[in-house]
From Swiss-Prot:
Keywords: Cytoplasm, Lyase, Schiff base. The gene is deoC. This is Deoxyribose-phosphate aldolase. It comes from the Bacteria. CDD domains: DeoC. It catalyses: 2-deoxy-D-ribose 5-phosphate = D-glyceraldehyde 3-phosphate + acetaldehyde. GO terms for biological process: 2-deoxyribose 1-phosphate catabolic process; carbohydrate catabolic process; deoxyribonucleotide catabolic process. GO terms for cellular component: cytoplasm.
Length: 223
C-alpha cells in the first residue's frame, strides 16, 4: 500500500510558549508539503488563517485544550469564536473527569453544545485514551457516533500517553467506516504513522509532519 502521508497530517503546534513566528513557520511548512491542515490554539487561528488564505491547507483549532474541564458554555463559545476567526475544523477535549464520575449525560451534552455551535464545521472529539478504559473509549465513541460528529481523536499529547495502535483499532471498530479517526500524540516517524493508518486512522495529528513525509526521525520531545 502506497500512502500519501501528507494527506493525513494535521501539522500541529500547541505549545503554550509557541510564538507567532513559529506559527508562521508551521504554516509555511504545511504549504510546502501540502499537509491536510495545521492545528493551533484558538488564539493563533487569525494568524494561521491569514497565512493559509488561498491554499488548500485547512486551519484546525483546539477547544478546551488540553484539560477539557472548563465550562461547557465556554467551550461552545470558543468553538464559535474560532470558526468566526477562520477555523475550518474544531478539535475539542471531552471532560474526562465527568466521564470517570459517571456523569454520562453531562459529557454528551458538553459535546453536543460544541457540535451545535460548529454547525457545518467538522468537529473532532479528543478522548484522551491514555486515561480511559477500553469500555470508556467505546462509550465515548458510541456517544460521538450518535451525535454525528466528524471524528474521534485519541489524545491531546499533553497527558500521560499518546496514540496507541490498539486504541485506534478499537475506536475504528466502534465508530465504523463512516466516521474519521484521528491518531495524535507520539506519532513522530513514518513507521508509527503507517501503523496508525493501517489500524484505522484517517488523520494524524503531529508536530513531526516534515520528518514523516521525508522519512526521518523527529526528536522525542515532538508532539
Amino acid at each position: 500500500m502506497t500512502i500519501n502521508y501528507a494527506n493525513y497530517i494535521d501539522h500541529t503546534l500547541l505549545a503554550m510558549d509557541a510564538t507567532e513566528e513559529q506559527i508562521i513557520k508551521l504554516c509555511e511548512e504545511a504549504k510546502q508539503h501540502h499537509f491536510y491542515a495545521v492545528c493551533v490554539n484558538s488564539g493563533y487561528v487569525p494568524v494561521a488563517a491569514q497565512q493559509l488564505a488561498g491554499t488548500s491547507v485547512k486551519v484546525c483549532s483546539v477547544i478546551g485544550f488540553p484539560l477539557g474541564a472548563g465550562l461547557t458554555e465556554a467551550k461552545a463559545f470558543e468553538a464559535q469564536a474560532a470558526i468566526k476567526a477562520g477555523a475550518q475544523e474544531i478539535d475539542m477535549v471531552i471532560n474526562v473527569g465527568w466521564l470517570k464520575s459517571g456523569k454520562i449525560a453531562e459529557v454528551k451534552a458538553d459535546i453536543k453544545a460544541v457540535r451545535d455551535n460548529c454547525a457545518s464545521t467538522p468537529l473532532k472529539v479528543i478522548l484522551e485514551t491514555c486515561l480511559l478504559s477500553d469500555a470508556q473509549i467505546v462509550q465515548v465513541c458510541e456517544m460521538c457516533r450518535e451525535l454525528d460528529v466528524a471524528f474521534v481523536k485519541t489524545s491531546t499529547g499533553f497527558s500521560t500517553g499518546g496514540a496507541k495502535e490498539e486504541h485506534v483499532k478499537l475506536m475504528r471498530a466502534t465508530v465504523g467506516q463512516d466516521m474519521g479517526v484521528k491518531a495524535s500524540g507520539a506519532v513522530r516517524d513514518r513507521a508509527t504513522a503507517e501503523t496508525m493508518i493501517k489500524a484505522g486512522a484517517t488523520r494524524i495529528g503531529t508536530s513531526s509532519g516534515v520528518a514523516i513525509v521525508s522519512g526521518q526521525q523527529a526528536s522525542a520531545s515532538s508532539y
